[in-house]
Amino acid sequence: MSGIPHDHYEPKTGIEKWLHDRLPIVGLVYDTIMIPTPKNLNWWWIWGIVLAFTLVLQIVTGIVLAIDYTPHVDLAFASVEHIMRDVNGGWAMRYIHANGASLFFLAVYIHIFRGLYYGSYKAPREITWIVGMVIYLLMMGTAFMGYVLPWGQMSFWGATVITGLFGAIPGIGPSIQAWLLGGPAVDNATLNRFFSLHYLLPFVIAALVAIHIWAFHTTGNNNPTGVEVRRTSKADAEKDTLPFWPYFVIKDLFALALVLLGFFAVVAYMPNYLGHPDNYIQANPLSTPAHIVPEWYFLPFYAILRAFAADVWVVILVDGLTFGIVDAKFFGVIAMFGAIAVMALAPWLDTSKVRSGAYRPKFRMWFWFLVLDFVVLTWVGAMPTEYPYDWISLIASTYWFAYFLVILPLLGATEKPEPIPASIEEDFNSHYGNPAE
Protein backbone atom coordinates (compact mmCIF):
# COMPACT_ATOMS: atom_id res chain seq x y z
CA MET A 1 0.00 0.00 0.00
CA SER A 2 1.34 3.43 -0.91
CA GLY A 3 1.94 5.84 1.94
CA ILE A 4 -0.33 8.72 2.84
CA PRO A 5 0.70 11.85 0.88
CA HIS A 6 2.27 14.39 3.24
CA ASP A 7 5.18 16.78 3.65
CA HIS A 8 8.52 15.10 4.30
CA TYR A 9 11.55 16.47 6.08
CA GLU A 10 13.59 18.95 4.06
CA PRO A 11 16.98 19.98 5.51
CA LYS A 12 17.43 23.75 5.52
CA THR A 13 20.95 24.50 6.77
CA GLY A 14 24.23 23.20 5.45
CA ILE A 15 24.81 21.11 8.57
CA GLU A 16 21.34 19.56 8.29
CA LYS A 17 21.95 18.69 4.64
CA TRP A 18 25.37 17.21 5.45
CA LEU A 19 23.91 15.05 8.23
CA HIS A 20 20.85 14.07 6.21
CA ASP A 21 23.01 12.80 3.34
CA ARG A 22 25.04 10.62 5.70
CA LEU A 23 22.64 9.65 8.52
CA PRO A 24 19.02 10.75 7.97
CA ILE A 25 18.10 10.33 11.62
CA VAL A 26 16.46 13.78 11.86
CA GLY A 27 14.31 13.02 8.84
CA LEU A 28 13.32 9.66 10.33
CA VAL A 29 12.24 11.28 13.61
CA TYR A 30 10.39 14.03 11.74
CA ASP A 31 8.49 11.59 9.52
CA THR A 32 7.66 9.49 12.59
CA ILE A 33 6.20 12.23 14.77
CA MET A 34 4.60 14.18 11.92
CA ILE A 35 2.95 11.15 10.32
CA PRO A 36 -0.63 11.87 9.13
CA THR A 37 -3.02 10.23 11.59
CA PRO A 38 -6.78 9.74 11.15
CA LYS A 39 -8.40 12.71 12.86
CA ASN A 40 -11.27 10.66 14.31
CA LEU A 41 -9.22 8.45 16.66
CA ASN A 42 -10.98 8.07 20.01
CA TRP A 43 -9.68 7.41 23.52
CA TRP A 44 -9.25 3.67 22.85
CA TRP A 45 -6.18 4.62 20.82
CA ILE A 46 -4.23 5.97 23.81
CA TRP A 47 -3.00 2.58 25.01
CA GLY A 48 -0.15 2.44 22.51
CA ILE A 49 1.77 5.16 24.33
CA VAL A 50 0.98 3.48 27.67
CA LEU A 51 2.52 0.27 26.33
CA ALA A 52 5.60 2.07 25.00
CA PHE A 53 6.14 3.89 28.29
CA THR A 54 5.60 0.74 30.35
CA LEU A 55 8.08 -1.24 28.25
CA VAL A 56 10.76 1.39 28.88
CA LEU A 57 9.80 1.46 32.57
CA GLN A 58 10.14 -2.33 32.84
CA ILE A 59 13.51 -2.37 31.11
CA VAL A 60 14.93 0.43 33.29
CA THR A 61 13.63 -0.94 36.60
CA GLY A 62 14.66 -4.47 35.58
CA ILE A 63 18.25 -3.37 34.93
CA VAL A 64 18.37 -1.60 38.30
CA LEU A 65 17.00 -4.67 40.11
CA ALA A 66 19.42 -7.00 38.32
CA ILE A 67 22.34 -5.08 39.85
CA ASP A 68 21.56 -6.46 43.33
CA TYR A 69 19.81 -9.73 42.41
CA THR A 70 21.64 -13.06 42.76
CA PRO A 71 20.38 -15.90 40.49
CA HIS A 72 21.17 -18.79 42.83
CA VAL A 73 18.68 -21.04 44.61
CA ASP A 74 20.36 -20.44 47.98
CA LEU A 75 20.61 -16.67 47.58
CA ALA A 76 17.82 -15.50 45.25
CA PHE A 77 15.11 -15.13 47.90
CA ALA A 78 17.52 -13.41 50.31
CA SER A 79 18.77 -11.06 47.57
CA VAL A 80 15.21 -9.92 46.86
CA GLU A 81 14.67 -9.24 50.56
CA HIS A 82 18.01 -7.38 50.59
CA ILE A 83 16.75 -5.19 47.73
CA MET A 84 13.55 -4.50 49.67
CA ARG A 85 15.25 -3.64 52.97
CA ASP A 86 18.82 -2.47 52.39
CA VAL A 87 19.03 -0.93 48.91
CA ASN A 88 18.06 2.73 48.69
CA GLY A 89 14.76 2.89 46.84
CA GLY A 90 14.89 -0.86 46.27
CA TRP A 91 11.35 -1.42 47.52
CA ALA A 92 10.07 1.19 45.04
CA MET A 93 11.97 -0.37 42.13
CA ARG A 94 10.62 -3.83 42.92
CA TYR A 95 7.03 -2.70 43.40
CA ILE A 96 7.13 -0.57 40.24
CA HIS A 97 8.56 -3.50 38.28
CA ALA A 98 6.09 -6.05 39.65
CA ASN A 99 3.03 -3.84 39.19
CA GLY A 100 4.41 -2.54 35.91
CA ALA A 101 3.98 -6.04 34.52
CA SER A 102 0.30 -5.90 35.46
CA LEU A 103 -0.10 -2.48 33.81
CA PHE A 104 1.70 -3.81 30.73
CA PHE A 105 -0.72 -6.73 30.38
CA LEU A 106 -3.79 -4.64 31.20
CA ALA A 107 -2.83 -2.20 28.45
CA VAL A 108 -2.06 -4.95 25.95
CA TYR A 109 -5.39 -6.70 26.59
CA ILE A 110 -7.26 -3.44 26.00
CA HIS A 111 -5.09 -2.87 22.91
CA ILE A 112 -5.90 -6.35 21.57
CA PHE A 113 -9.65 -6.14 22.20
CA ARG A 114 -9.76 -2.66 20.65
CA GLY A 115 -8.12 -4.16 17.58
CA LEU A 116 -10.63 -7.01 17.54
CA TYR A 117 -13.58 -4.60 17.79
CA TYR A 118 -12.45 -2.12 15.15
CA GLY A 119 -11.01 -4.72 12.76
CA SER A 120 -7.41 -3.55 13.03
CA TYR A 121 -6.30 -7.04 11.97
CA LYS A 122 -7.91 -6.83 8.53
CA ALA A 123 -6.03 -6.21 5.29
CA PRO A 124 -3.66 -4.50 4.81
CA ARG A 125 -2.65 -4.71 8.49
CA GLU A 126 -2.17 -8.47 8.88
CA ILE A 127 1.58 -8.16 9.47
CA THR A 128 1.04 -5.51 12.13
CA TRP A 129 -1.41 -7.83 13.88
CA ILE A 130 0.79 -10.94 13.67
CA VAL A 131 3.86 -9.07 14.96
CA GLY A 132 1.68 -7.83 17.82
CA MET A 133 0.68 -11.39 18.69
CA VAL A 134 4.34 -12.48 18.65
CA ILE A 135 5.09 -9.61 21.04
CA TYR A 136 2.28 -10.85 23.29
CA LEU A 137 3.71 -14.40 23.35
CA LEU A 138 7.15 -13.04 24.26
CA MET A 139 5.55 -10.93 26.98
CA MET A 140 3.99 -14.05 28.46
CA GLY A 141 7.31 -15.90 28.41
CA THR A 142 9.20 -12.96 29.88
CA ALA A 143 6.64 -12.42 32.64
CA PHE A 144 6.57 -16.12 33.53
CA MET A 145 10.36 -16.30 33.88
CA GLY A 146 10.37 -13.07 35.87
CA TYR A 147 7.80 -14.51 38.27
CA VAL A 148 10.18 -17.40 38.99
CA LEU A 149 13.12 -15.16 39.96
CA PRO A 150 12.05 -14.19 43.54
CA TRP A 151 12.21 -17.94 44.33
CA GLY A 152 9.19 -17.99 46.58
CA GLN A 153 6.75 -20.87 46.87
CA MET A 154 4.58 -19.71 43.96
CA SER A 155 7.69 -19.01 41.91
CA PHE A 156 9.05 -22.52 42.36
CA TRP A 157 5.82 -24.45 41.98
CA GLY A 158 4.61 -22.27 39.13
CA ALA A 159 7.83 -23.08 37.29
CA THR A 160 7.35 -26.77 38.06
CA VAL A 161 3.79 -26.82 36.70
CA ILE A 162 4.36 -24.73 33.57
CA THR A 163 7.60 -26.39 32.50
CA GLY A 164 5.87 -29.71 33.09
CA LEU A 165 3.52 -28.84 30.23
CA PHE A 166 6.35 -29.28 27.74
CA GLY A 167 6.84 -32.79 29.08
CA ALA A 168 3.33 -33.59 27.83
CA ILE A 169 4.44 -33.35 24.19
CA PRO A 170 4.55 -36.93 22.86
CA GLY A 171 8.00 -38.35 22.20
CA ILE A 172 10.17 -35.24 22.44
CA GLY A 173 8.45 -33.67 25.46
CA PRO A 174 10.71 -35.02 28.23
CA SER A 175 13.84 -33.99 26.30
CA ILE A 176 12.49 -30.46 25.78
CA GLN A 177 11.54 -30.22 29.45
CA ALA A 178 15.00 -31.35 30.58
CA TRP A 179 16.61 -28.87 28.18
CA LEU A 180 14.49 -26.03 29.56
CA LEU A 181 15.19 -26.95 33.18
CA GLY A 182 18.86 -27.76 32.69
CA GLY A 183 18.30 -31.02 34.55
CA PRO A 184 15.60 -33.39 35.79
CA ALA A 185 13.84 -30.79 37.98
CA VAL A 186 13.54 -27.07 38.70
CA ASP A 187 16.85 -26.13 40.29
CA ASN A 188 19.79 -23.75 40.07
CA ALA A 189 20.33 -24.28 36.34
CA THR A 190 16.67 -23.38 35.74
CA LEU A 191 16.95 -20.18 37.75
CA ASN A 192 20.09 -19.11 35.87
CA ARG A 193 18.50 -19.79 32.49
CA PHE A 194 15.33 -17.93 33.39
CA PHE A 195 17.27 -14.95 34.72
CA SER A 196 19.35 -14.74 31.54
CA LEU A 197 16.31 -14.99 29.26
CA HIS A 198 14.26 -12.62 31.40
CA TYR A 199 17.01 -10.03 30.98
CA LEU A 200 17.32 -10.61 27.22
CA LEU A 201 13.72 -10.89 26.01
CA PRO A 202 12.60 -7.30 26.80
CA PHE A 203 15.16 -6.07 24.27
CA VAL A 204 13.80 -8.54 21.71
CA ILE A 205 10.32 -7.21 22.48
CA ALA A 206 11.56 -3.64 22.00
CA ALA A 207 12.93 -4.58 18.56
CA LEU A 208 9.60 -6.17 17.60
CA VAL A 209 7.76 -3.09 18.86
CA ALA A 210 9.86 -1.02 16.43
CA ILE A 211 8.82 -3.40 13.62
CA HIS A 212 5.19 -3.20 14.80
CA ILE A 213 5.28 0.61 14.64
CA TRP A 214 7.05 0.52 11.27
CA ALA A 215 4.37 -1.82 9.91
CA PHE A 216 1.41 0.36 10.87
CA HIS A 217 3.22 3.51 9.75
CA THR A 218 3.53 1.84 6.34
CA THR A 219 -0.16 0.94 6.05
CA GLY A 220 -1.50 3.88 8.05
CA ASN A 221 -3.40 3.75 11.30
CA ASN A 222 -6.81 2.13 11.52
CA ASN A 223 -9.63 4.25 12.98
CA PRO A 224 -13.10 3.80 14.52
CA THR A 225 -14.83 3.76 11.12
CA GLY A 226 -12.42 1.31 9.50
CA VAL A 227 -12.45 3.59 6.44
CA GLU A 228 -9.05 4.16 4.86
CA VAL A 229 -7.46 7.59 4.60
CA ARG A 230 -7.87 8.91 1.07
CA ARG A 231 -4.58 8.70 -0.80
CA THR A 232 -5.69 10.22 -4.10
CA SER A 233 -4.07 13.55 -3.29
CA LYS A 234 -2.37 15.43 -0.48
CA ALA A 235 -5.40 17.74 -0.18
CA ASP A 236 -7.79 14.81 0.37
CA ALA A 237 -5.40 13.18 2.85
CA GLU A 238 -5.21 16.41 4.86
CA LYS A 239 -9.02 16.45 5.13
CA ASP A 240 -8.94 12.99 6.74
CA THR A 241 -5.87 13.39 8.96
CA LEU A 242 -3.96 15.52 11.41
CA PRO A 243 -0.22 15.34 12.11
CA PHE A 244 0.64 13.07 15.03
CA TRP A 245 2.51 15.98 16.63
CA PRO A 246 1.16 17.96 18.41
CA TYR A 247 -2.47 16.82 18.31
CA PHE A 248 -2.25 13.15 19.24
CA VAL A 249 0.97 13.39 21.25
CA ILE A 250 -0.61 15.89 23.66
CA LYS A 251 -3.77 13.79 23.91
CA ASP A 252 -1.75 10.62 24.55
CA LEU A 253 0.45 12.30 27.16
CA PHE A 254 -2.63 13.54 29.01
CA ALA A 255 -4.09 10.02 29.01
CA LEU A 256 -0.73 8.57 30.10
CA ALA A 257 -0.63 10.98 33.05
CA LEU A 258 -4.06 9.79 34.21
CA VAL A 259 -3.08 6.12 33.86
CA LEU A 260 0.16 6.70 35.78
CA LEU A 261 -1.76 8.48 38.53
CA GLY A 262 -3.73 5.29 39.14
CA PHE A 263 -0.65 3.10 38.68
CA PHE A 264 1.49 4.90 41.25
CA ALA A 265 -1.46 4.96 43.66
CA VAL A 266 -1.43 1.15 43.50
CA VAL A 267 2.37 1.06 43.89
CA ALA A 268 2.23 3.36 46.92
CA TYR A 269 -0.84 2.11 48.77
CA MET A 270 -1.46 -1.53 47.79
CA PRO A 271 1.62 -2.85 46.00
CA ASN A 272 0.93 -6.50 46.90
CA TYR A 273 -2.77 -6.47 45.99
CA LEU A 274 -2.20 -8.44 42.78
CA GLY A 275 0.46 -10.72 44.26
CA HIS A 276 0.19 -13.94 46.25
CA PRO A 277 1.19 -14.16 49.93
CA ASP A 278 2.78 -17.61 49.44
CA ASN A 279 5.50 -15.98 47.37
CA TYR A 280 6.81 -14.34 50.55
CA ILE A 281 7.70 -17.86 51.71
CA GLN A 282 11.02 -19.16 50.41
CA ALA A 283 10.76 -21.95 47.84
CA ASN A 284 10.49 -25.39 49.41
CA PRO A 285 10.49 -28.39 47.03
CA LEU A 286 9.11 -30.59 49.84
CA SER A 287 6.02 -28.47 50.55
CA THR A 288 3.40 -28.01 47.82
CA PRO A 289 1.01 -25.03 48.19
CA ALA A 290 -2.64 -25.94 48.59
CA HIS A 291 -3.60 -24.02 45.45
CA ILE A 292 -1.09 -23.03 42.76
CA VAL A 293 -2.25 -19.83 41.03
CA PRO A 294 -0.34 -17.90 38.35
CA GLU A 295 -0.37 -14.12 37.99
CA TRP A 296 -3.76 -12.67 37.03
CA TYR A 297 -2.75 -11.93 33.43
CA PHE A 298 -2.18 -15.66 32.79
CA LEU A 299 -5.47 -16.76 34.33
CA PRO A 300 -7.69 -16.78 31.18
CA PHE A 301 -5.39 -19.17 29.33
CA TYR A 302 -4.61 -21.11 32.50
CA ALA A 303 -8.37 -21.70 32.80
CA ILE A 304 -8.45 -23.00 29.21
CA LEU A 305 -5.48 -25.27 29.98
CA ARG A 306 -7.35 -26.86 32.90
CA ALA A 307 -10.80 -26.89 31.28
CA PHE A 308 -10.30 -29.98 29.13
CA ALA A 309 -10.04 -32.67 31.80
CA ALA A 310 -9.79 -36.40 31.13
CA ASP A 311 -13.57 -36.93 31.53
CA VAL A 312 -14.59 -34.37 28.86
CA TRP A 313 -16.07 -36.17 25.85
CA VAL A 314 -13.96 -34.39 23.24
CA VAL A 315 -10.78 -35.29 25.15
CA ILE A 316 -11.91 -38.92 25.41
CA LEU A 317 -12.65 -38.95 21.67
CA VAL A 318 -9.30 -37.44 20.65
CA ASP A 319 -7.46 -39.69 23.10
CA GLY A 320 -9.07 -42.74 21.50
CA LEU A 321 -8.54 -41.60 17.91
CA THR A 322 -4.85 -40.92 18.56
CA PHE A 323 -4.38 -44.15 20.57
CA GLY A 324 -3.44 -42.22 23.70
CA ILE A 325 -0.88 -39.94 22.06
CA VAL A 326 -3.00 -36.82 22.72
CA ASP A 327 -4.05 -37.34 26.33
CA ALA A 328 -5.85 -34.83 28.55
CA LYS A 329 -2.65 -33.04 29.56
CA PHE A 330 -1.41 -32.60 26.00
CA PHE A 331 -4.91 -31.64 24.85
CA GLY A 332 -4.94 -28.87 27.46
CA VAL A 333 -1.57 -27.59 26.21
CA ILE A 334 -2.86 -27.57 22.62
CA ALA A 335 -6.01 -25.75 23.75
CA MET A 336 -4.05 -23.10 25.66
CA PHE A 337 -1.72 -22.26 22.77
CA GLY A 338 -4.56 -22.71 20.30
CA ALA A 339 -6.56 -20.04 22.13
CA ILE A 340 -3.78 -17.57 21.34
CA ALA A 341 -3.27 -18.90 17.80
CA VAL A 342 -6.91 -18.31 16.82
CA MET A 343 -6.47 -14.63 17.68
CA ALA A 344 -3.48 -14.47 15.35
CA LEU A 345 -5.63 -16.04 12.60
CA ALA A 346 -8.42 -13.46 12.99
CA PRO A 347 -7.48 -11.65 9.71
CA TRP A 348 -8.44 -14.77 7.76
CA LEU A 349 -11.25 -16.04 9.99
CA ASP A 350 -13.25 -12.79 9.82
CA THR A 351 -14.88 -12.82 6.38
CA SER A 352 -16.80 -9.54 6.68
CA LYS A 353 -16.02 -6.77 4.18
CA VAL A 354 -16.63 -4.16 6.89
CA ARG A 355 -13.79 -3.58 9.35
CA SER A 356 -15.30 -1.73 12.27
CA GLY A 357 -17.69 -3.27 14.77
CA ALA A 358 -19.36 0.15 15.02
CA TYR A 359 -21.28 -0.75 11.83
CA ARG A 360 -21.86 -4.45 12.54
CA PRO A 361 -24.81 -4.91 14.96
CA LYS A 362 -24.67 -8.72 15.24
CA PHE A 363 -20.91 -8.68 15.55
CA ARG A 364 -21.14 -6.19 18.44
CA MET A 365 -23.34 -8.56 20.44
CA TRP A 366 -21.03 -11.53 19.97
CA PHE A 367 -17.94 -9.38 20.62
CA TRP A 368 -19.19 -8.15 23.99
CA PHE A 369 -19.99 -11.77 24.89
CA LEU A 370 -16.32 -12.48 24.09
CA VAL A 371 -15.19 -9.70 26.45
CA LEU A 372 -17.44 -11.11 29.18
CA ASP A 373 -16.11 -14.58 28.39
CA PHE A 374 -12.54 -13.34 28.89
CA VAL A 375 -13.48 -11.88 32.29
CA VAL A 376 -15.14 -15.17 33.29
CA LEU A 377 -12.05 -17.14 32.24
CA THR A 378 -9.89 -14.81 34.34
CA TRP A 379 -12.14 -15.45 37.34
CA VAL A 380 -12.37 -19.26 37.04
CA GLY A 381 -8.63 -19.47 36.36
CA ALA A 382 -8.07 -18.42 39.97
CA MET A 383 -10.59 -20.95 41.32
CA PRO A 384 -9.88 -24.58 42.28
CA THR A 385 -10.62 -27.27 39.68
CA GLU A 386 -13.87 -28.44 41.22
CA TYR A 387 -17.59 -28.13 40.51
CA PRO A 388 -18.98 -25.70 39.33
CA TYR A 389 -15.76 -23.93 38.25
CA ASP A 390 -14.65 -26.80 36.01
CA TRP A 391 -17.91 -26.66 34.05
CA ILE A 392 -17.85 -22.87 33.82
CA SER A 393 -14.29 -22.92 32.49
CA LEU A 394 -15.22 -25.59 29.92
CA ILE A 395 -18.22 -23.57 28.67
CA ALA A 396 -16.20 -20.34 28.58
CA SER A 397 -13.32 -22.05 26.75
CA THR A 398 -15.74 -23.52 24.21
CA TYR A 399 -17.18 -20.07 23.49
CA TRP A 400 -13.70 -18.62 23.01
CA PHE A 401 -12.95 -21.08 20.22
CA ALA A 402 -16.49 -20.90 18.81
CA TYR A 403 -16.23 -17.12 18.46
CA PHE A 404 -13.14 -17.25 16.27
CA LEU A 405 -13.70 -20.53 14.42
CA VAL A 406 -17.49 -20.47 13.89
CA ILE A 407 -19.09 -17.11 14.66
CA LEU A 408 -16.62 -14.81 12.86
CA PRO A 409 -16.68 -16.78 9.57
CA LEU A 410 -20.49 -17.09 9.62
CA LEU A 411 -21.11 -13.43 10.46
CA GLY A 412 -19.33 -12.34 7.30
CA ALA A 413 -21.83 -14.31 5.22
CA THR A 414 -25.02 -13.62 7.19
CA GLU A 415 -24.69 -10.16 8.74
CA LYS A 416 -26.08 -7.03 7.10
CA PRO A 417 -23.82 -4.14 8.17
CA GLU A 418 -25.00 -0.59 8.68
CA PRO A 419 -24.01 2.12 6.16
CA ILE A 420 -20.44 3.32 6.63
CA PRO A 421 -19.27 6.90 5.98
CA ALA A 422 -17.68 7.66 2.63
CA SER A 423 -14.61 9.15 4.30
CA ILE A 424 -13.03 9.90 7.66
CA GLU A 425 -13.77 13.57 7.04
CA GLU A 426 -17.49 12.80 6.75
CA ASP A 427 -17.46 10.83 10.01
CA PHE A 428 -15.50 13.55 11.81
CA ASN A 429 -17.84 16.31 10.61
CA SER A 430 -20.91 14.30 11.64
CA HIS A 431 -19.61 14.24 15.22
CA TYR A 432 -17.91 17.62 15.55
CA GLY A 433 -19.31 19.73 12.72
CA ASN A 434 -17.61 21.13 9.66
CA PRO A 435 -14.74 23.46 10.68
CA ALA A 436 -15.51 25.64 7.65
CA GLU A 437 -19.03 26.41 8.88
Curated annotation (Swiss-Prot):
Heme b b562 binds at H97, H198. Its cofactor is heme b. Gene3D superfamilies: Cytochrome Bc1 Complex, Chain C (1.20.810.10). The chain crosses the membrane at residues 45-65, 100-120, 129-149, 156-176, 194-214, 248-268, 298-318, 330-350, 365-385, 391-411. It comes from the Bacteria. One of its GO terms (biological process) is respiratory electron transport chain. Keywords: Cell membrane, Electron transport, Heme, Iron, Membrane, Metal-binding, Respiratory chain, Transmembrane, Transmembrane helix, Transport. Its main location: membrane. Belongs to the cytochrome b family. The main subunits of complex b-c1 are: cytochrome b, cytochrome c1 and the Rieske protein. This is Cytochrome b. It comes from Rhodobacter capsulatus (Rhodopseudomonas capsulata).
